[in-house]
């Protein structure tokens, strides 16, 4: 910080001199006992195309009378290619669930209580099941 002064500096008189509060010797500099730490540089690998699938690449539909929302729908893009996990739970304990792929054109599967579907992202940024592109998916429970 600088301030205006009238004082003698080095045997000279100075009017409106600028004097700095910055230390002029190493004895004026405060010291710290805290050691300095550095971290290793991080490298970020570029994302691959098959890590870039989004939730909207497959439409979750609700057209069947027993359709219901998926209990969860998540994407893990930390692997070589992204993985989408959809969980369909029964409406009531002991109930059956069914997951329909492409309005049953690509099949359906399910079971009692809950069913988990794993979709894989391909190099065209499409979600696939056993190599079949899934454009629509639906959770059903009676």
Swiss-Prot record:
It comes from the Eukaryota. It holds the Pfam family C6. InterPro entries: C6_domain. SMART domains: C6. This is Uncharacterized protein R07B1.7. It comes from Caenorhabditis elegans.
């Amino acid at each position: 910080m600088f301030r205006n002064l009238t004082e003698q500096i080095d045997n000279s008189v100075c009017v409106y001199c600028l004097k700095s509060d910055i230390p002029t010797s190493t004895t004026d500099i405060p010291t710290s006992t805290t050691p300095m730490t550095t971290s290793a540089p991080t490298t970020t690998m570029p994302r691959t195309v098959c890590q870039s699938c989004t939730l909207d690449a497959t439409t979750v539909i609700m057209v069947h009378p027993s359709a219901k929302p998926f209990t969860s729908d998540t994407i893990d893009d930390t692997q070589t290619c992204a993985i989408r996990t959809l969980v369909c739970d029964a409406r009531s304990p002991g109930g059956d669930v069914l997951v329909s792929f492409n309005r049953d054109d690509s099949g359906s599967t399910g079971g009692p209580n809950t069913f988990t579907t794993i979709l894989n992202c391909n190099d065209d940024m499409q979600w696939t099941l056993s190599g079949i592109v899934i454009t629509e998916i639906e959770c059903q429970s009676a």
